[in-house]
Curated annotation (Swiss-Prot):
Protein name as annotated: Protein SLE2
GO BP terms: protein stabilization; response to abscisic acid
Native species: Glycine max
Composition bias type Basic and acidic residues, residue spans: 7-17, 38-52, 71-89
Tissue expression profile of the protein: In seeds, expressed in the embryonic axis and in the cotyledons. Not detected in leaves, stems or roots.
Annotated Low complexity bias: 93-105
Alphabetized PROSITE patterns for the sequence: SMALL_HYDR_PLANT_SEED (PS00431)
Region (Disordered): 1-105
Stated role: Late embryogenesis abundant (LEA) protein interacting with non-reducing sugars and phospholipids.
Membership in a protein family: Belongs to the small hydrophilic plant seed protein family.
Further information: Belongs to the 'natively unfolded proteins'. The drying rate significantly affected the structure of the protein.
InterPro entries: LEA_5 (IPR038956), Sm_Hydphi_plant_seed_CS (IPR022377), Small_hydrophilic_seed_prot (IPR000389)
Induction: Down-regulated by drought in 30 days after fertilization seeds. Not regulated by drought in leaves, cotyledons, hypocotyls and roots.
Coiled coil: none
């Protein structure tokens, strides 16, 4: 029990010195803050995946993976002839809204 407490104190001290001690906890100023950041980032990504569906989430990752400091993922995809199907990005609510707009035309 004391060993676990010492380990936690050591990790907290390293976090306070600016080291990332929890995967996904970048930016947290303490062990607890890093744990909360990592949990929130994980939940945010999972929520987005649920909204977009697996295909949309993969397309978005493909586009994001092409981006650089100089160019957006869209610009790089166009230059390199890589097709990105942005229709897969739309969430369930957007799909319904777009269908309604199409009917109005």
């Amino acid at each position: 029990m004391a060993s676990r407490q010492n380990n936690k104190q050591e990790l907290d001290e390293r976090a306070r010195q600016g080291e990332t001690v929890v995967p996904g906890g970048t930016g947290g100023k303490s062990l607890e803050a890093q744990q909360h950041l990592a949990e929130g980032r994980s939940k945010g990504g999972q929520t987005r995946k649920e909204q977009l569906g697996t295909e949309g989430y993969q397309e978005m990752g493909r586009k994001g993976g092409l981006s650089t400091v100089e160019k957006s993922g869209e610009e790089r995809a166009q230059e390199e002839g890589i097709g990105i199907d942005e229709s897969k990005f739309r969430t369930g609510n957007n799909k319904n809204q777009n269908q309604n707009e199409d009917q109005d035309k």
